[in-house]
Amino acid sequence: MKMEANELSKIYGEGENRVTALDRASFQIMPGDFISITGPSGSGKSTLLHLLSGLDQPTSGRLTYDGQDIYSLSDRERSALRRRSIGFVFQQFHLLPVLTARENILMPLLLDKKQPNEAYLEQLTQLLGIGSRLTHLPHELSGGQQQRVAIARALIAQPDVIFADEPTGNLDSRSGGEVMEMLRAIHEKMEKTLVIITHDNRMAQMADRRFSIVDGILTEVGGR
């Protein structure tokens, strides 16, 4: 899925309280891109992710998915598009404590009243190294394993794009490195578009395209 932002802006407040969180960003995300976005706290990184994923509306500008202006859709249509096309990974794992790893992974399908593809589930969990942990509850898993479960949950509906907001921020250096390698493997082996917001320079350097955002201004700064 091709994503294209044109003069995308987000402004909060008015008058002296006016804050430009994103200032006229224009860029494309092509199918299969691996993109990292870095910047200081409060620079607009999360605002950009929320706009790109349709979780928030811009003050001005346009965002299209394969030519479709997503902000011309109703909230219900945009929500359905997110469920079908986008997976999310966050710093917090957001696993339901009373459900097993398998049940947590399958939750998006259950909410959408879809049956799981068992072959795909096995491929996904083996790739992430959690195939033997599917009957475990979250508290029985390490932090790194819990994040792998969260990644599998983001991928179970086979979305086109994965948005990851500080996916290693809650992990120690070793577990964070393992999660980084797994995200790269998913990008390469499953040909998923991957957009990562990170403070981790190691992860940023792994991306094919690197962006920096400072005071709401987005700049492409390089790539591999």
Predicted regions: what they are:
Residues 2-213:
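ABC family nucleotide-binding domain
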Residues 210-222:
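H-loop (His-switch) and adjacent beta-strand-loop-beta switch element
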